[in-house]
Amino acid sequence: MKIPMKLILLKIFQVVLFLCTVPAWGADFIPAITNYTVKDYQGAHQNWACAQGDDGVMYFGNNNGLLVYDGFSWELYKVPGGYIVRSVFVDKDKIYIGSFEEFGYFTRNVTGGMEYHSLSAKVKNQDAPNDEIWHIVR
């Protein structure tokens, strides 16, 4: 029985293609991770929450306030009273934060900075003094 030349060439091609992938088998996948220190972002040591906006900007609830990282630089925005930001939630152009007896949101102003708008006075049933907002849900 004679084997067609096309079939032989196809099998040789398959073996060569298979052997080309062998070096990739032993390669470990290591994601690109960058660790930042307190000196890098000029905040406190503890970060309590994080969220990412549609534009890729990262927001972190920190002991010193709201940290904003755009992939190149860090910005720190304080919350009135200097409280710890415990929760962060991004909804379009508003960055909601929860803190000690404080709830509100940041928005970008015309100069590119962030402005804080408190919603605490508008929250009903404020019968829980000395309470912190740990989670924000839609």
Please provide the spans of the model-predicted regions.
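Carboxylate-rich, polar loop motifs that coordinate divalent cations or form catalytic acidic clusters
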Residues: 1-138
